Amino acid sequence: MSPKTETKASAGFKAGVKDYRLTYYTPDYETLATDILAAFRVTPQPGVPPEEAGAAVAAESSTGTWTTVWTDGLTSLDRYKGRCYHIEPVAGEENQYIAYVAYPLDLFEEGSVTNMFTSIVGNVFGFKALRALRLEDLRIPPAYSKSFQGPPHGIQVERDKLNKYGRPLLGCTIKPKLGLSAKNYGRAVYECLRGGLDFTKDDENVNSQPFMRWRDRFLFCAEALYKAQAETGEIKGHYLNATAGTCEEMMKRAVFARELGVPIVMHDYLTGGFTANTSLAHYCRDNGLLLHIHRAMHAVIDRQRNHGIHFRVLAKALRMSGGDHIHAGTVVGKLEGERDVTLGFVDLLRDDFIEKDRSRGIYFTQDWVSMPGVLPVASGGIHVWHMPALTEIFGDDSVLQFGGGTLGHPWGNAPGAVANRVALEACVQARNEGRDLAREGNEVIREASRWSPELAAACEVWKEIKFEFEAMDVL
């Protein structure tokens, strides 16, 4: 019997409890190209050595349990166990370590984000030997990523469908998010699209409530976007939220959206679940629908620095599960997001190949082997004065969404949309002429407001509005 396949049954079984590090801490291990690699921020309980804590994470998220079991002898642990292969202290933090764990590919079902997370972030996060645990990053090998469809269409296909190039796309979340009738909701959609926006959006918690059932909303929104298209000559879209209480109901809503001929639907991927999201993404590719993804509930999982899952991991998981857009923070708005960290996972969403860069929180080089990219969506507390910064930070391949920054315009919804479109076009033109938006952005907006009364009114309303709080998610 070769060492690779030797079992404990052949060597004799000894019952009892032994340290995890004796089996699962392997500092000499050389990772394989097919391994899934994980970087965990580990905070051990007092008295627990970091090697034991890292090994416990590797064990409890793969083949291990709290005691030796005789059935270990019926398989090859060397083939299937996770391995903690490196540990390093976290600079500036007491009793925190980054534990690197390698998982053999055979531990995971092909094409299943659900199974991947059930293993890697399952019971181990409640393990008593750990005071706190955070999954900072994952390296998804090409051998595994190729088992996923990924985004239904991707960035280039979306631009071709919309016939829009050379600038960020503009959107707006309809407000108030709850309480409008379907007809009034459709009216707001029409006014925003007619004013110059590319998209309008259901808020994440708009599903099918008593004040507005989903079918009525879909019908009035479809009417609104077709009317706006006819008047502007531009292709328009509204993110029709298909999220529902069951997968069957979700698919029924997506089918109805396709029958209406609209270009895009929406899903809340964390509250809806990865299984539902992947099913919807497959339907969208097969039926020509774009898929907008909202990350509602993400901050419950990712906001604490020492416990949970970093959003860069949730972003990678979404690219695998499938989505053409995902909300990714704004850096400058009301929602959490530090610049370097945000741009790190924005690149992980959009690019084919991303080098390891710890200055941006990227722990591993990631090769997506031509999986379609995802457009990051900047949304939350942004207005026309933010347009230069947003254009400079996110670049062309992004969606900039102004909810209150459109519907809060003193002259109404359509003028609010006009103000945002004028501001965006002015920023793109200035950038293309070689001007520095980071330094000259405010002047670019002031110049444009001289010939756009809608923009001038918006500038006056929001000139003092800032959200200057310290970010929690910093390196």
From Swiss-Prot:
What does the UniProt record tell us about how this protein is modified after translation? The disulfide bond which can form in the large chain dimeric partners within the hexadecamer appears to be associated with oxidative stress and protein turnover.
Reactions catalysed, semicolon-separated, are:
2 (2R)-3-phosphoglycerate + 2 H(+) = D-ribulose 1,5-bisphosphate + CO2 + H2O; D-ribulose 1,5-bisphosphate + O2 = 2-phosphoglycolate + (2R)-3-phosphoglycerate + 2 H(+)
Q: Which UniProt keywords apply?
A: Acetylation, Calvin cycle, Carbon dioxide fixation, Chloroplast, Disulfide bond, Lyase, Magnesium, Metal-binding, Methylation, Monooxygenase, Oxidoreductase, Photorespiration, Photosynthesis, Plastid
Q: Please list the residues that carry the modification N-acetylproline.
A: 3
A Pfam family per the record: RuBisCO_large
Q: Which GO terms describe its biological process?
A: photorespiration; reductive pentose-phosphate cycle
Maturation-removed propeptide residues: 1-2
Q: Which residues carry this modification: N6-carboxylysine?
A: 201
Superkingdom in the source lineage: Eukaryota
Subcellular localization is given as: Plastid, Chloroplast
PROSITE patterns (alphabetical): RUBISCO_LARGE
Give the UniProt family note: Belongs to the RuBisCO large chain family. Type I subfamily.
Main function:
RuBisCO catalyzes two reactions: the carboxylation of D-ribulose 1,5-bisphosphate, the primary event in carbon dioxide fixation, as well as the oxidative fragmentation of the pentose substrate in the photorespiration process. Both reactions occur simultaneously and in competition at the same active site.
> What remark does the entry add?
The basic functional RuBisCO is composed of a large chain homodimer in a 'head-to-tail' conformation. In form I RuBisCO this homodimer is arranged in a barrel-like tetramer with the small subunits forming a tetrameric 'cap' on each end of the 'barrel'.
PANTHER family listed in its UniProt record? RIBULOSE BISPHOSPHATE CARBOXYLASE, RIBULOSE BISPHOSPHATE CARBOXYLASE LARGE CHAIN
What protein name applies here?
Ribulose bisphosphate carboxylase large chain
Organism this protein belongs to: Amborella trichopoda
In the UniProt record, what gene is named as encoding this protein?
rbcL
